[in-house]
Amino acid sequence: MTFVMETRVVPFIALLAVVFACLFNWPIWLHLYDILSQLERVKTGFVISLPILLVAALNFVFVPFSIRYLLKPFFALLFVISAIASYTMLKYGVQFDQTMIQNVFETNQSEALAYVSTPIVAWVTVTGILPAIGLFFIKINYANRWYKGLLARALSMLVSLAIVTAIAALYYQDYVSVGRNNSSLKREIVPANVVNSTTKFIYKRFLVEPIPFTTLGNDARRTASSAKPTLMFLVLGEAARSKNYSMNGYARETNPFTSKAGGVISFRQMRSCGTATAVSVPCMFSNMGREEFDGNLARNSEGLLDVLQKAGISIYWKDNNSNCKGVCDRVPNIQIQPTTNPTLCKGDTCYDEVLLQGLDDEVAKMKGDKMLAFHLLGSHGPTYHKRYPSEQRKFVPDCPRSDIENCTTEQLVNTYDNTIRYADLVVARLIARLKQYEEKYNTALIYLSDHGQSLGEMGLYLHSAPYRIAPDEQTRIPMQIWMSPGFIKEKKLNIRCLQKNANATPYSHDNLFSSMLGIWDVKTTVYDKRLDIFSPCRTTQAP
């Protein structure tokens, strides 16, 4: 092989540290610039020390991977990963914590391809793939004695450690002050953030001692019966935020269909359990609240649908999203396949109206009291323009591309509002279908989103921000309820009471588990009356 460059291993690792610090860490440098520019007084030495500290720290952690036969493939992979991470951080404002890594591991081909655009391909090619290939055309000279190589590496690490120690001694208070007030900085260092979060995720998901599977609600039973069975639709939205719902005060008419359906109650103070589907969906269907939620426990435990099924309610889950994140694994379910409906499916995704296909037959096959759950594709980004058919393109100009950061704010908001409006159409059509069943069933529909979405506010796009610093756009979600007169009478509900609470009372995903058990009159020890939204508004209290 013809080499274009020749170098010794220790200087080469130091060079890599400089390259990674400069090339892939633009997000943290820009963030630090914003932070420091707002301070009244900043020490010049402190500012100068920042890149020196990062280079020294990266060199310290890079050196152990400078082993012959490992160095080139390891850093080639790191170049590509860092290129992808730096682009998404810079353009979308995302942070690579464990939740983001979980999203990466659980995404499907359709979701992954939605993020592919000319800018990201160009960036990853120039800063990731080409340097990765270039590594193999560099001749690296190693020491002819193993102990000499070990000594050189140890010396390099000691020098790095000495630099870090010296900087800490000189500017400790400055680093503590900036770090304490901006805790997210530690999650912005590339590639440390990706490697650290990935390692933790893999350990917790695959390497910890397996947790015994836990059953829930083995004592579940119905406390009320009716000559007329109940049919309920539970609709799970995707990336819809309360802020853009006209029924919650948004200036645009994004809910023209449900607002005219009659009797729809919109909950204005609803919050999600997480900022990503991988967290929110398992959380809302579990009996754990957001504060104590543990994804590993949830994966090894039954949830809401299991308890309802034990109580004798027929359950069926229809999914037009990636999957149900495990919550429907033990109930009858179907994953919509794009090949099944060429009219409503384009490429590898389908419009949410596809969920209404075959609905009458599915309801007819179920026995007794029935609940169908529908998982919408909703406002899944970044390809918002693919979530609604052309005839539902109400707000224009929209943003017909995946690199949404290159659209104007007007285009992006128009596109997102079109997705909200189209989801509203689907929900309204489900309500219309329930009205057709009123002679045979007491009917009801509950709609809520899994999490919200950022549209460029504060430089953030999409979702998955760490919950403690996530903006309201990612955590404030819509929730709507519609009930037939027969359902209201059967459940002895005071609608004025429910409407009043919906307007002013703060609720969250934590309320879903017990609210569903309560409204279905399921008696079980895992029911918590305090979390039941319906209980205060029933003349006969839930069990």
Where in the sequence are the language-model features?
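Active-site-proximal alpha/beta segments of enzymes that process anionic O-linked groups
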Residues: 168-234, 239-400, 476, 508-539
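A long, amphipathic alpha-helix that forms part
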Residues: 189, 357-360, 399-443, 481, ...
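Catalytic cores of PAPS-dependent sulfotransferases
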Residues: 64-73, 92, 307-317, 362-365, ...
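Transmembrane and membrane-interface helices of multi-pass
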Residues: 1-187
